[in-house]
Amino acid sequence: MAAALLALAALPVGAAEAPLALAWRTPAGNELLELDRSRVLARGPLPAERQAPLGSLWKLFVYAYLVDRQQPDPGYQCLGHDRDEVYCCNPGERIDRDQALVKSCGLYFDPARLGVTPDDWSRYWQARSAPAWLQRLDALKPEARVPVADLLAQLQTLPAQDEARRVLLDVPLQARDAGVLATLGARLRVKTWSWLADADPQARQGGFAGWLNDGTPVWAGGPGTSQRVLGQYAEVLERTLPVSWPREPGSCVEVRLFSRYPLREVSLAGQSTPVAPGALRGRYQVLFENGNRLDIESQGELFLERRDDGLALTAHLEREDYVARVLDREAAPEPVEAAKALAVAVRTYLVQNAVRRGECLVIDDSSSSQRVAPRPASAASRTIAAWTADLVLAGSTVTYHSERAGPDRLSWQQAVTEAKEGVRYDSILARAFPRASLSRWDKPVAACQALPNAEDWLRRQRREWRPVLDAEPGYAEIPQFSVCRLASGRPHVDRERRRIFVRGLFSLQDRLDLTHEYLHLAFEAHPNGQDEAYVERLARQLLLE
């Protein structure tokens, strides 16, 4: 096995047959896997001599240094004078430290600009017994070749890694290929890297390094840019990476169980004597004032309290445990894609509706909000919660119902049907919440800044255009779509999410752009939808004649 791995490792990275190398730390030591786009080709110990270019991973170490030393964030203002600003922001815009890490903005992390001196840097990393290449600021270059084992060791103990993991969820969220997030979910918290290929300076190699969401250090490298690696290897990574409980499962959620049903007493299972208020451990039976009984189970997270209005049963849960318990109570962990969609909706409902009390979020267990299972979550639901950890929707109010769909409401029954048809969770959510975008818990940002006036205009015009459009081969009216503000670039459509990105509705050109892009959607199942000349001619006919 070791010989096979060394042979694979010796292949030029730019060669067509070169596999993706994936390394991580395990309890038994560092492990190296070699993968093609469909399977694991080889697995064995990570050779100590295995090296890779540092690429843009140097920015992760500068980020950790700045955050750990509590250095103020000076931001970076793009003025349009430096071509490397393409990795940062548009002229006139400003980027902060977290955004700079995700976008790999080297101009932000320039040590001289930040006032990081070689002596301060060296002392800081020497105190942490870092390898020599990390102690020298002048050696922290993208072309520097460093042992992969060193990278994994430093990631294991990196300062500020909790903050980095939180921020780096934006890497799959902002990936050019939407399939990365759809396939991998929230499991990878990694900084991407790219550099010149070893054997061909005209080619590229790239990958990522960081953590799985349980804190396991991970590194990957293969042919092509980092975005190409993520996109082309997402499917095999999905099958290879474990789904583990997150290292940071979220702040506490305080839930008053059975908030609408007064309690008479709580007793140990099989006994009739009521238990005293306090933390509960074991199996119990709840007797309600209406005479109904219910079995519950606690591992110390449920508390029986005596309040002015009677007995109360309160659960103190980690956020992701809360999501898993709601999933068990409101629906089921299967079909998996439907369950993933509902888990995101549950988490979003929590952040939109809970009341903050100190470090905890407070929400009732009620059919008018979200019902919570009064027992440990099933392993299957915990897996769904872990796979989607920290993912929420931004841009819409989120509700859900077991059967009824509606504006900004997810129907579990409909989600199940769509999942069985092969629809992935992100598309299930996009259909239920067309204006919303997947985002992260601590900083929900909507990718679609809705233009309601433009959407209303298009819907009105569409009714007038119907006689003309219905006569065109391949036309299919789109029942649900969103019109979003275009931040930069050319007008376009996101077919998967049914979104039209335009500048506004201020001029004739804006209206032409909006009509043109809508027609691309409406003819997407017909060759006419790919014919730019046809689409533009029809758009002008509709607007100008």
List each language-model region with its residue ranges:
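A short, well-structured edge-of-sheet supersecondary motif
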Residues: A16-G44, F208-N213, P217-G221, V483-C484
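Post-HExxH zinc-binding segment in Zn-dependent metallohydrolases
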Residues: N90-P91, I95-Q99, Q461-E477, H526-E545
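Active-site scaffold of zinc-dependent metalloenzymes
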Residues: I478-R511, E524, L538-R540
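Conserved, single-site charged/polar hotspot
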Residues: A15, R165-R189, A197-Q205, A209, ...
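Catalytic Zn2+-binding segment of zinc metalloproteases
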Residues: R69-Q70, Y518-Y534
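Short alpha-helix carrying the canonical HExxH Zn2+-binding catalytic motif
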Residues: L54, W58, F506-A522
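Active-site-adjacent helix/loop patches that line small-molecule binding or acyl-intermediate pockets
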Residues: A18-L22, Y76-V167
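Active-site SXXK
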Residues: R50-P74, A100, R256-F258
